[in-house]
Amino acid sequence: MSATTHIDAPALPKRGKSKPFYKVLYVQVLFAIVVGVLVGWLSPHFATNEWIKALGDGFVKLIKMVIAPIIFCTVVSGIAHIQDARKVGRVGIKALLYFEVVSSFALVLGLIVGNLFPVGHGLAAKPDAGAVAKYVDQASHMSAVDFVLHIIPDSVVGAFAKGDILQVLLFAVLFGFALMALGERGHRLRDVIDDAAHAVFGVIAIVMKAAPIGAFGAMAFTIGKYGPAALGNLIGLVALFYATSALFVVLVLGTIAKFVGFNIFKFIGYIKDELLIVLGTSSSESALPQLMEKLERLGCSKSVVGLVVPTGYSFNLDGTNIYMTLATLFIAQALGIELSFGDQVAILLVAMLTSKGASGVTGAGFVTLAGTLAAVNPALVPGMAIVFSIDKFMSEVRALTNITGNGVAAVFVSWWEGELDHDRLRANLSRNVDPSDVETAVTTG
């Protein structure tokens, strides 16, 4: 019987080979953002050139192009290594129930904080509706029935061509079950899919080298278009989002962790290396393989980790959920649009659906935001251009919250299944773990 397969991520740094600070991606991105602010402030005419704007838009598109193959490979791999089909269904139901409850807490928290601290008031922005038209086209309004039917693709090729995550996810689940049913005959194809995932993560590593260019273009264009005065409100939104995400991790995830029997801060320390990878890439998927390996070493069931973590990257994005409701309120405040209690309930209900299509890759949360705004009030959609400039700042914390949330989810579902090794959990969280001990590898037994 084969052991669980895990996929190397090329972003994992080797110990003992410290880069010069100017070669660190996060430093480069911060430098690019500062330069973008200066260019937008000192030369607004140049900064609003369509080619400058295209730098930011192009980077987001580069990231989005690899979302579908990543989701397919990780979900198929997770399911294909489980031998009991009934267990897949049982674990899946428990995971989805957990995802829905915790995601709802994140969405509600964003609404509460956004109402208590209306940092968008006074911005009085009047953005161009065409600035974000391409995002709106990908997130058109649909009814609940349309949403369910939309999950079923007209063709598998079409699902991948359009990059529709929920359609790809459905096919991946079915394909994983079919591969699992093949038994030994399916092992060769399963290994091919694992190898394909290696290549996709390699593409991400290449694309992320362009992150500073994308950040420069997005920031320069926004400051050039709206002026440096917009920074005050935007910084307020960033600070509020940081604080809300931290509150969620400590209050909600911390409570869940305590219920299971571990300390959330020790858990964060345990996955600190994965968090640093995420911080440098602003993509929670860049650390997915390492996270899965560490969760198994922590005492979680291999089969639970293989199913819960990849699925959580579409269904359990806590940071993205907080961002969606908080950003929606900020945009409404900035545009001077009053949202009634009924409107905000609608935001919550719509976001509970649209958030399930978000992926843990940079830019996906922004597209999902378009779907929420278009469904609640189309007049809010042009305001997305306001927050796009600072999306890089918020993307970092979104990704950090997402990966922490998915890690806690795997531990909780393993505990719920009665397959959590509490002795290993306590032992690993009570000591520092060398990153070299958790190098991921493809293993077969």
From Swiss-Prot:
Q: Which UniProt keywords apply?
A: Cell inner membrane, Cell membrane, Membrane, Symport, Transmembrane, Transmembrane helix, Transport
Is Mitochondrion one of the keywords UniProt gives this record? no
Can you cite a GO biological process for this protein?
L-aspartate transmembrane transport
Membrane topology, record value: Multi-pass membrane protein
Q: Which residues cross the membrane?
A: 24-44, 62-82, 105-125, 163-183, 201-221, 234-254, 322-342, 370-390
Q: Spell out the subcellular localization from the entry.
A: Cell inner membrane
The main location class comes to: membrane
What GO molecular function terms would the record report? fumarate transmembrane transporter activity; malate:proton symporter activity; succinate transmembrane transporter activity
KW Membrane (keyword) present: yes
One short Pfam name that applies is SDF
Q: GO CC annotations?
A: plasma membrane
Q: What is this protein's function? A: Responsible for the transport of dicarboxylates such as succinate, fumarate, and malate from the periplasm across the membrane.
- Family to which this protein belongs: Belongs to the dicarboxylate/amino acid:cation symporter (DAACS) (TC 2.A.23) family.
Protein's name according to its UniProt entry: C4-dicarboxylate transport protein
Protein species of origin: Rhodopseudomonas palustris (strain ATCC BAA-98 / CGA009)
Output the lineage of the source organism. Answer: Bacteria, Pseudomonadati, Pseudomonadota, Alphaproteobacteria, Hyphomicrobiales
